[in-house]
Amino acid sequence: MSKDKITPLVDYSSSETSSSDGWCDEGKEVFVDDFADKPMDMGHVSGGWAGHVYLVVKESAGLRRISQACIEEICQRSDDAGTGKAETVECGQTSVIKEADIRSRVRRMEGLHVSLTRVFYLQEHEISGFVEILERAVLASSHGAFAVGFSKASMYANETGSREFVGLDIGSGEERLAKIVGAVDEVMRRFGKEPFFSNPRFHVSIVRAERGKGGRGMIGKGLGQAMHEEILALPAVQISQLECVFGNRRFCIAL
């Protein structure tokens, strides 16, 4: 991502350089998110189990529609820009063909969620105690289910730059999220783990894209104004469940 400025997930003021159409244009800020697709990919490592705490976001018809529209626009822009084309040489002649796997590298995210922790590690004998303390802390601070609304879309990437994401930034409901993060942070500190970012960018990643050949990004241009207006018009989504995963072990806490 030589043209992109990659910054940590920070507070919303850091996103002011984003384009007016609601998504970072090429050369603008790209926010680091190294756990957008982690819940299903983590497992046991020597010395501990990888953990992640997040709030479950139920996929609505509106989110599915926006996700698919983003995929279509990304693929179309990549094709128009030549990202989805490759040169081949046959019988001494060079031809340009469309890469067969362009769509396979851009896909809708499953298991939509809002992260509340970084990835952390616990010993197996610590897991049950952690979950019990986490449940008490969260229930004392969450005050039941609540709704969140979306303000705009931003471009995110993992730290290695191998994957990019379209994330819907959360606007309404941010205060409730901050209270829950505060409770989770206290539990993390109790177990000697690093708390979440001090001013997190709460978001839901809806589309992921693998980097193309030669490190070319699949996501690099802004969404159109019409798409931005659709995002703003999305109904609020209900948050009613927190999950904590350690490898293939999943613990659910109803708010």
Model region roles, listed by residue range:
Residues S2-L255:
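Histidine-dependent nucleotide/RNA phosphoesterase domain, centered on the 2H-phosphoesterase fold
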